[in-house]
């Protein structure tokens, strides 16, 4: 039987999470993409702590963005999560695309975070 898009995404997500592990030296940059918004977190999996977070739901960003579901908004979140991580002394991360394909909004966020100084 053919897999649905949701089942395919869940399988990719499980496969990615099996290979990607965040540590205190190199935490995980996890990205969640919904139809309307995008969310990014820097997570230390050994302590189960979120070290930094950014999303298009935040009031200061929401007012300046035309839409939370385009590549421009994703790039803004990438820059913001990189700035917040660098403030806390985090320069290296492991990228967790969360089962999403590395394309479009996910790619825009990743490239903006790299340009802003995160290493992955």
Swiss-Prot record:
<keyword id="KW-0687">Ribonucleoprotein</keyword>
<dbReference type="GO" id="GO:0008097">
    <property type="term" value="F:5S rRNA binding"/>
</dbReference>
<dbReference type="InterPro" id="IPR005484">
    <property type="entry name" value="Ribosomal_uL18_bac/euk"/>
</dbReference>
<protein>
    <recommendedName>
        <fullName>Large ribosomal subunit protein uL18</fullName>
    </recommendedName>
</protein>
<dbReference type="GO" id="GO:0006412">
    <property type="term" value="P:translation"/>
</dbReference>
<comment type="subunit">
    <text>Part of the 50S ribosomal subunit; part of the 5S rRNA/L5/L18/L25 subcomplex. Contacts the 5S and 23S rRNAs.</text>
</comment>
<keyword id="KW-0694">RNA-binding</keyword>
<dbReference type="InterPro" id="IPR004389">
    <property type="entry name" value="Ribosomal_uL18_bac-type"/>
</dbReference>
<keyword id="KW-0699">rRNA-binding</keyword>
<dbReference type="GO" id="GO:0022625">
    <property type="term" value="C:cytosolic large ribosomal subunit"/>
</dbReference>
<feature type="compositionally biased region" description="Basic and acidic residues">
    <location>
        <begin position="1"/>
        <end position="10"/>
    </location>
</feature>
<comment type="similarity">
    <text>Belongs to the universal ribosomal protein uL18 family.</text>
</comment>
<keyword id="KW-0689">Ribosomal protein</keyword>
<dbReference type="Pfam" id="PF00861">
    <property type="entry name" value="Ribosomal_L18p"/>
</dbReference>
<comment type="function">
    <text>This is one of the proteins that bind and probably mediate the attachment of the 5S RNA into the large ribosomal subunit, where it forms part of the central protuberance.</text>
</comment>
<dbReference type="GO" id="GO:0003735">
    <property type="term" value="F:structural constituent of ribosome"/>
</dbReference>
<feature type="region of interest" description="Disordered">
    <location>
        <begin position="1"/>
        <end position="26"/>
    </location>
</feature>
